[in-house]
Regions:
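PLP-dependent amino-acid enzyme catalytic core
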Residues: 1-255
Length: 255
């Protein structure tokens, strides 16, 4: 089983320099360079789930997501690479998207749950039928979440610290990240252990259950519910953007 450190070797800390950042030093942890198919935070969130499946000699992995799910994409790729069958429980009705085609190419078996069926994922007995259909498969929460997902992200703090010297830094003031479910943020808070604040920019409306999820993960990890804050960076819905944000992205890419 490939361990986290072998993937972390590809992590790069890249300092950005923009005119509008005069007086502020900003560096980005380039997790997109880790692996062509297991990139971003997805590998780190999956690493402990994969280790648990390996330890239990599970024949496969089963998880949930949408027709554009980066999580399911990484899970299917990991299953193919490490010899584990994969099953995806998808939101809505059957769709043909680039992500879905990749899932099929990686060998993932797909079940479309509709929207009502997908909402049932939070019910206590949701997994029972799927465990009966796929005995001994390791069930991975939506998005690679749970304490195992957060624990896999703890190592990111050490990766950042180990690379500060490469850009001439000896410390930093805070960690910022985009937040979907809060799993990665919880991992960073655990890893920081109060040394630096962690600020999460919400990709979805604040009404989503992110604060409750982070609080629960920190409780499970035995950590105080402190050392982080959330700011609303959403544009009316999960992952949406408006004209102002689109112009900013284009300008940043040009610069």
């Amino acid at each position: 089983m490939v361990v986290v450190d072998s993937f972390a070797a590809g992590v790069v800390l890249h300092e950005l320099r923009f005119d509008w950042l005069r007086g502020v030093r900003l560096a980005v942890l380039r997790l997109d360079l880790v692996d062509p198919e297991l990139s971003g935070n997805k590998w780190f969130k999956l690493s402990h789930h994969l280790a648990a499946a390996h330890a239990a000699q599970a024949p496969g992995l089963i998880s949930l997501g949408g027709a554009h799910s980066n999580h399911l994409h990484a899970l299917a790729a990991a299953g193919q690479r490490f010899g584990l069958a994969t099953v995806g429980l998808l939101r809505g009705t059957e769709q043909d998207t680039p992500t879905v085609r990749d899932l099929q190419r990686f060998g993932m078996r797909l079940h479309w749950l509709g929207y009502g069926g997908y909402r049932a994922r939070h019910q206590p007995q949701f997994w029972d039928a799927w465990r009966a259909l796929y005995p001994n498969y390791h069930c991975v929460p939506e998005g690679g979440g749970g304490l195992a997902g957060a624990s896999g992200c703890v190592t990111l703090v050490a990766q950042i610290r180990a690379r500060l010297g490469e850009i001439g830094w000896d410390d930093y003031e805070a960690l910022w990240l985009a937040v979907g479910t809060g799993t990665t943020l919880a991992g960073l808070v655990i890893g920081e252990a109060g040394n630096h604040p962690v600020i999460g920019a919400l990709a979805g409306p604040p009404a989503h259950a992110v604060p409750d999820n982070v609080r629960r993960l920190l409780d499970e990890a035995g950590r105080a519910d402190a050392g982080y804050r959330l700011v609303d960076a959403s544009r009316g819905g999960f992952g949406r953007f408006d004209g102002e944000l689109a112009r900013f992205i284009l300008q940043a890419e040009r610069d």
